[in-house]
Structure formats: C-alpha cells, structure tokens
Regions:
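Basic/polar N-terminal segments that are highly enriched at the extreme N-terminus
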Residues: 1-3, 25-31, 742-753
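Bacterial N-terminal signal peptides that target proteins for export
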Residues: 2-15
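Ala/Thr-enriched low-complexity intrinsically disordered regions
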Residues: 14-16, 22, 747
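Hydrophobic h-region of N-terminal signal peptides that target proteins for export
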Residues: 18-28, 487
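Beta-strand-centric surfaces of beta-sandwich/beta-rich domains
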Residues: 29-558, 562, 591, 613
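Beta-strand-rich ligand-recognition modules
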Residues: 131-166, 306-332, 336, 447-498, ...
Length: 753
C-alpha cells in the first residue's frame, strides 16, 4: 500500500524509511547505509563508510583483451534467440546503472526473481529509422533526469533508476547487432544496516518525484543554506600572483564539514585559472588530499567556451557556469574533517590572477570519525602513456603515505587528448578493489564511461553524473589549441564503488593500450587511512600443507592439476611484444562438496570470501554452508548461493552487413584468460564473535548450454585459492590529527584585496 501527495510523490514507505534512518542516527547507533532512491535523497552521506557493500561493473567487453567490434555483442550465454544474456546474478542486490549504445539490443529483458520485464526505447520498433527525441519505454518508469537516451547523450541510452532484486537478476538482449553495454550493481553482507529493505522492482512504480526534483537541481546550489543546521559561510576576494600560493581559508579546533566551495573569476582570466592548482589539506596531514588543476577538479579539462554556453559543467556535484562577465565554479561534494581544514590556490607561471571571488560554506560534523571519510582528488599527468599498460589514475597504496585505505571511489574528471584525437576513447575502464586480480569493474570504452557512445558524435554534453564538456569534433574543426583539449567526467553517487583496503583505478588508452595521447586525470574518492576489510586467512587448494592446515576435505575432488594462464588485464601481446606473460598455479575441481576451515576476526561485521578459480568451467554455482568449528557437533547453516555466470568462452553474435534485425549467431570464442577472482559475502550472523568458521561448498550444476542446442558444457566447481577478509570498523578516531591543532575553534580567511 502506498499513499501519494499530489505532485510530490512521497510514499508512506518512503516516510517510514526516513523515520527509521533518523531514529537510528539519533540513538547513537551506526547509521544505515542509504540504498535505492535513498542513495540520492541522502546524498549528504556520500562520505560515509559502506561496510559490507560491494560494487561490480560487468559488460560486453571483448574476452580476448582486444576491442572486437568496439567490445559489442559478447554474451555470457544465449538462453533463447531473443535472450542473449549479458548479466546474471543470484542473491539480493540492486542494479544502479545501465548503459547501452543507442537502441541496439532493445528490447531488453530484465528478469527479476523469475518475472520478465521488457524495457525498450522508442526506436525499437523500427531500428532502421531511429526516432529523434527518443525515450525509454515504459516512459514513466525511466524519466529524466535519471534516464537519458542518445538524443541527449549524443550516443548512449543511460539509466540511473535503482532496480532491486531479492533472489535473482538476469539481463538479456533481444537483438545482437552492436549489442554493447555495461552495468553497475551492489551486493550486501546480509545483516548490514540499510536505510530500507531490498525489494524487487515491480515494473510498475515510477521513481518518486522528490528524487527527480532533487536531481533536476543539478547546476544550481544544492547544499544546505547558511543558517540551517549550524551552517556558516565565509567569503572573500584575493589576488594570485604568478607562481605563488595563497591560503584561501582555514578552520581548526573541531570536527566540521564543508558543503559548498565556490570560486568566480573574470572571463578574460578563465584560461589561465584553468591551470591554477587547488590544494585542500585535512587535519594537518603531511600531504594535501586534494591537489589538482582547478578546472579539471571542477569537471572540465580547460575553461575554454567555444560556443559561449551558459554551462560547461551542469552536474550534480560540480558546476561551471558562465555569465556575461565571470565564470563561476562550484563544488558540492561533502568534505568532512576532524580537526582542521586548509584550502590553498597556487598560481600559474607568467600570469598574475586577480579579482578571484571565493566562498566556503561549512558546518559541524556529527558523525564519528571512523564512520565518515576524507574527500580526495588525486591528480596524475600522463604525457606519454606506456604501450601495453593501462593509464593508472589511482592506486591508494601509493598516495598520501600509502598503506591501507577504506572508503569509496566516486568518479573521475580527465583529459584524454590535447589534440582532439577521439580514437583513444576505445580504451576500457578497469578497476580493482581490495587485492583482487580480476577487475571488479570492466567497461567497454572510455566515452561510455563518460556517458556517451560513438565518441559522443564529437559533440559536447553535460548531464548530472556524466559529460563531455570540452573539446572539438576533430583537430581540423578546432578553433584553437585550447579547443583541442578533450575531457570527460563521471560521478558515482548511488552507484559508487566501496573498498575496504585499497583501490586501483585504470583506463586503457586506445583499444589495445597503444594510444600515445596525453592524458591528465583526477580520481575522486572518499577514504580514511585505515582498513575496514582485513585479510585474516588464505588457503591454497592443491598444496598439501595448506590443505592439512585448513582441514580440507573434498571426497570427489580431482587430483591437483597445474594451470598456465592469465587474468583479464587487457591484451597480453601488442605489436609483437608480450605485455604480460602467462603464469602457473595449481588447484582442483569437484562435482561434489568441499569443506575447509578459515580464521576470521571475532569482531567482524561479516566476512568476504574470495576464490581464485579456473574460469573454463561454465556457470559455476554452489550452496555455501557455515558452521562453528568450536562446537562439538557441526551445526551447518546456509549462507547463500555462490554463483558466477559465464566462463572464458563466450558467445559472439554480430549479424553482418550492419543488419539490425539479423538472426542471432552462435560464434563461440574462448580466451586464454582462465584465472579469475570471485567473491562471496557471508552473513554477519554466521560469523560475528567467531575466530574461526568451517565452510562447506556443495556444487549445484547449472545445465544450460552456451546456446540452445549447443554442446553440453563442462561443469564443475573450481578452487585454486580461498582468502578470508573480515569487515571491521576502521581503527581511526581523528584524535591524532586533532592533537596537532589548537583546542579552540578558529577560522582564518584570506584578506580581501
């Protein structure tokens, strides 16, 4: 049952969820993690720690590491001629984002908990004659500003509508020509406190209008106003002499949070201000957590406005707006600190900047230090990307002193060419979290990551969470050298990517890491210098000593066998040069059960179990059971289903002659990448208070061939290595930083000139 107030879309269940959330915060208990549409409503909780949440980004990428047909039309398996499966998940979760290339592949099947929902767009009926101003269908379920089609994005159909599922989710394409896409979804440790229970999408209820109204405010001041909830605002004016630095604002003595940071400059100084350096330091840490060129931090590679647009960037957290005389740059990402904050600007060589207006809106921080996190913007310059190696935007193990960090990756702003060369955009995003050797996030291209398709048609666009704000269609059409600077941005809110130990963010440059374009990148992330996911045990299957140590029993397991293969790290050979060689490992496979014992942290909030496996076996599925080894007689409790769809053999279908309506093809492609890491989340009620657990894996085969009528697949459960990670509260209080600042709250601001 739901009740709507006309024109506002508030439901009883929405109000109840917010009351539940507020009550938890008021009681002093750990706050609930915002999920579903609450992730937008509660956007002020962007910095909060997401313990027990995992994000995954799956796609139609070329399994061989290349760029075949621009990473399109590679399917996990084909359930039927009009059911070409690209995503198959078992267990509760939320799909937060999907991206398709135009209408290709539509109608799309969203099979949720056994119910098939058809999603399509207005060009589906006659794809040979696409419809301008197209929309998703059903239109009311996929409205702007949470869904856009190629008419707005210049090449892609995008949806940020949360799609919940309680048991299973399967996505399939009805047509296969140019069927490309990537999808971001979250899984949760059962027992994690959420703002609302996960409920299956019903295919009938539109997103609430309060959320649509909120996201529609992108490009405006969305932060709490001064005077509300203790918010204050300081402002001033400064000059920035060439090659010199100026402190803009400082605050010390008590925990706080910046909710809005704004600069404005005369239009005739905009190009020079692009390269001014913005630095922000939290709690007197030795290095600034934000250290980036000003324009790139605010979402654009350069403050060059070819078409005299009002907005270069009209996103939800960042805005670059022009009026008749000035350029206004605004950031609304929440920025907590626990003792002090300092904002600085560093000038550029050969140019004096003056008449810089600034303002900072800030207020008290009420969250405990280990439940929040610092904002970071890590800048990297890549003038000559190395052939065969991804461009690395971030490795948290090597920033700000290194070590363990816990938080979430929330986006990028990056220049991908200084010469209007769009071909480098064929490169795929690859993101690795918490020691994984398999990317938890693997995309299909760089402009896809930036919300476009087909290089945005060379056009500029700006949306709440993705955009291509600057850059000409080609070097030949560029009006100046500044017009050749190409940049894109992508922000993650509901679809952010948590990590508990480390994050490695990479972009392939060109379709096979061969581009020589000059990249400059900013990776946005929240993080504390302490782990929330700690490695407590590791067990190597096939190693006699490790098997004895972990009480491994598997009556039907194969003898240990050696595998020589690779992980999915892009092309292994480029221009005749081997980029990364194969490696060897040992493991077993079983069609029965395996049992073993693992050590965990008794203060855990749940456990993540990672398995290294041989991905040559299709659709590996097993029941997972957990028992307390300290008990006299094992009492097994079911932890869930561990399912990994697909294998290193995929089905490729790309009808010839660009035939949109061509029949589905069944071309099997097997890659040389058999190694894969996969993850399973064990409910906290089965692990809390225990220092050891016994795990039972029972193989449950999925008798589905790669395509209807195809040969019977090779089925087994592969196990090479198991690693246990325990979720814990980060050991961080903020006190060490607070001791280095005065005990009385004090704010310093730059003097007006």
């Amino acid at each position: 049952m739901s009740l709507e107030r006309s024109g506002r879309g508030w439901h009883i269940k929405t109000i109840a969820a917010l009351v539940w959330f507020a009550a938890g915060c008021a009681s002093g208990a750990s706050p609930a993690i915002p999920v579903g549409l609450d992730a937008y409503r509660m956007w002020g909780r962007w910095p909060m720690q997401r313990l027990g949440v995992r994000a995954y980004m799956r796609s139609t990428y070329d399994r061989t590491g290349g760029n075949e047909t621009a990473d399109a039309s590679h399917f996990l398996y084909q359930f039927a001629p009009d059911r070409n499966v690209t995503l198959d998940v078992e267990g509760p979760g939320i799909l937060y984002f999907v991206r398709y290339n135009h209408w290709h592949g539509s109608p799309w099947h969203y099979e949720i908990d056994g119910t098939d929902h058809i999603v399509q767009e207005t060009s589906t009926a006659d794809p040979l004659h696409p419809v301008e101003n197209s929309t998703f269908l059903p239109r009311d379920l996929f409205p702007k500003p949470l869904a856009f089609t190629w008419s707005d994005t210049k090449g892609a159909d995008l949806s940020w509508i949360p799609i919940g599922f309680e048991k299973t989710f399967r996505m399939a394409y009805s047509r296969t020509f140019y069927g490309t896409g990537y999808y971001i979804y979250h899984r949760f440790v059962d027992g994690t406190k959420l703002s609302r229970p996960i409920q299956s999408w019903d295919g009938r209820t539109p997103p609430s209008s309060d959320v649509l109204d909120l996201i529609s405010k992108a490009g405006t001041d969305i932060a709490p106003a001064a005077g509300q909830s203790g918010m204050r605002q300081n402002h001033g004016k400064l000059a920035l002499p060439r090659s010199q630095s100026r402190v803009v604002w400082t605050r010390s003595g008590s925990p706080g949070i910046i909710r809005a940071l704004e600069f404005s400059i005369p239009r005739d100084q905009a190009l020079a201000f692009s390269r001014a350096r913005l630095r922000m330091t939290w709690d007197d840490r030795p290095q600034p957590s934000i250290d980036a060129p000003a324009s790139l931090f605010f979402g654009a590679g350069i403050l060059y406005n070819r078409d005299n647009r009002e907005y270069l960037v009209k996103s939800f957290p960042m805005v670059i707006r022009y009026d008749a005389t000035r350029v206004h740059l605004s950031c609304y990402l929440p920025m907590p600190f626990f003792g002090s904050a300092r904002i600085e600007l560093a000038g550029v060589p050969d140019v004096d900047l003056d008449d810089i207006d600034w303002s900072v809106r800030f207020g008290p921080l009420k969250d405990p230090a280990n439940e929040s996190s610092y904002l970071h913007a890590t800048y990297r310059d890549h003038p000559q990307p190395e052939v065969g190696k991804d461009v690395e935007l971030l490795d948290t193990r090597n920033v700000e002193g290194g070590g363990d960090w816990s938080g979430q990756f929330i986006g990028t702003s990056f220049i991908f060419s200084h010469d209007a060369d769009l071909r480098t955009l064929e490169g795929d995003p690859r993101f690795f979290f918490d020691d994984s050797q398999t990317p938890q996030a693997q995309g299909t291209g760089t402009e896809e990551w930036g919300g476009g398709g087909d290089y945005w048609g060379g056009l500029n666009m700006t949306l709440p969470f993705a955009g291509h704000p600057v850059g000409a269609r080609s070097a030949q059409e560029a009006k100046s050298a500044e017009d050749r600077v190409e940049s894109a941005y992508r922000f993650l809110l509901a679809d952010l990517m948590p990590f508990g130990k480390n994050a490695v963010i990479r972009l392939e440059h060109g379709g096979t890491n061969e581009s020589t374009q000059h990249y400059e990148t900013v990776a946005y992330w929240y993080g504390l210098p302490a782990a929330s996911l700690i490695k407590t045990d590791e067990f190597s299957v096939g190693d006699d000593g490790s098997e004895r140590q972990h009480n491994y029993v598997s009556p039907d397991a194969s003898p240990p066998y050696e595998i020589e293969s690779r992980y999915e790290w892009g092309p292994d050979t480029i221009q005749g040069m081997e980029v990364f060689p194969a490696s060897k490992d040992r493991g077993r496979s079983t069609k029965g059960t395996s049992e073993f014992r693992l050590q965990i942290d008794p203060k855990n909030l749940g456990v993540m179990l990672r398995r290294k496996l041989d991905y040559s076996f299709l659709n590996q599925r097993a029941e997972v059971w957990v028992a307390d080894p300290a008990a006299g007689k094992a009492s097994w409790r079911k932890a869930g289903i561990w399912y990994l769809a697909g294998s290193n053999t995929c089905v490729y279908s790309f009808p010839p002659n660009r035939n949109e309506l061509g029949a589905t093809e069944h071309v099997l492609q097997t890659s040389n990448r058999r190694f894969r890491d996969d993850e399973f989340l064990i409910p906290s009620e089965l692990t809390r208070g225990r220092s050891k657990i016994r795990v039972r894996i029972r193989f449950t085969p999925v008798e589905t061939p790669l395509y209807p009528g195809g040969p019977a697949p090779s089925l087994a459960w592969s196990e090479i290595r198991y690693t246990a990670y325990s979720y814990v509260h980060p050991r961080f209080s903020g006190r060490d930083s607070a001791r280095r600042v005065v005990s009385t709250s004090k704010t310093n601001i730059a003097p007006s000139d």
